Curated annotation (Swiss-Prot):
UniProt binding sites for Mo-molybdopterin: N79, Y82, E83, C137, T172, N220, R225, S236, I237, K238
GO-annotated cellular components: periplasmic space
A biological-process GO annotation: protein repair
Organism encoding this protein: Xanthomonas campestris pv. campestris (strain ATCC 33913 / DSM 3586 / NCPPB 528 / LMG 568 / P 25)
Identification of the protein by name: Protein-methionine-sulfoxide reductase catalytic subunit MsrP
Assembly mode: Heterodimer of a catalytic subunit (MsrP) and a heme-binding subunit (MsrQ).
InterPro entries: MsrP, OxRdtase_Mopterin-bd_dom, OxRdtase_Mopterin-bd_sf
Claim: Ion transport is one of the keywords in the record: no
Region forming the signal peptide: 1-59
Amino acid sequence: MSLRDALKTPSSEITDEAVYRDRRRLLQLFALTPALSVAGCAEADPPPPPKTVVTPAQARSGFRTAEELTRLEDVTSYNNFYEFGTDKTDPSKAAKTLKLSPWSVKVSGECEKPGSLSLDELLKGISAEERIYRLRCVEGWSMVIPWTGVPLGEVLKRFAPTSRAKYVAFTTLADPQQMPGVRYRSINWPYREGLRIDEAMHPLTLLATGLYGKPLPQQNGAPLRLVVPWKYGFKSIKSIVEIRFVEKMPETAWHDLQPSEYGFFSNVNPAVDHPRWSQKTERRIAGTASKLFAERIATKPFNGYADQVASLYAGMDLKKWF
């Protein structure tokens, strides 16, 4: 399946179709009225993101939520992607020149069918899906984002992992020529993340190729990133170039840098504070809310996906295995 095919699902399936029709009419209006002043446009409040319609079955699955979406402009301008800088606005400025084609992903380790595949080959034959997920950053802010992608488990199955594959390790591209942040040792590059095999195979775990019905922007992890909605955002590794099936728990970038602050599992848990701040509440960046003064809401265990994933951790001490 080509990326173009992967993103053919109409945007009306992400949000109310009438909203998209109104948006198109608005764009046509602007095109037909050049006399509209730029100053007037700048002064107007941006429209809130569209509301979504969620069926009971979708709500139970966790694949969609009726919560107010975060505006596209906020999703694409407020990012953590240290390969392009440490400020929230750095990635949207510095990542524009990241070359997305050709792009290949190497799959190796404890599997029967390893290989290096192009993006089209990796996703071939797997139907793309729309998922509206909450994203909770370990820093204490959150968003609600409509993603396009494929279930990670469906991709991993085609490599036939063996019984020794207990974990899945992921690696981000680290190219100092394209990624200015890699020239500095703020992190032990390349960026690495990992999941337990059952977490990787869980239906909620998404290999994302787009958001808001469009291909992923570079600053959001193009062309391929993880979205693991019940974990803190740094687990959703971006711009993936390597996947390895391994027997032992892999070392991950933030745990390597500060193991007392960033655990391997990093499930969203309001009962376990970060050593330097509380995790009981979060700033929800949604609608027209200011990023700095967004409403604080209570953080839910597993980011609100406990019904779907809590059983994965039955019997575990979640304060120890944070």
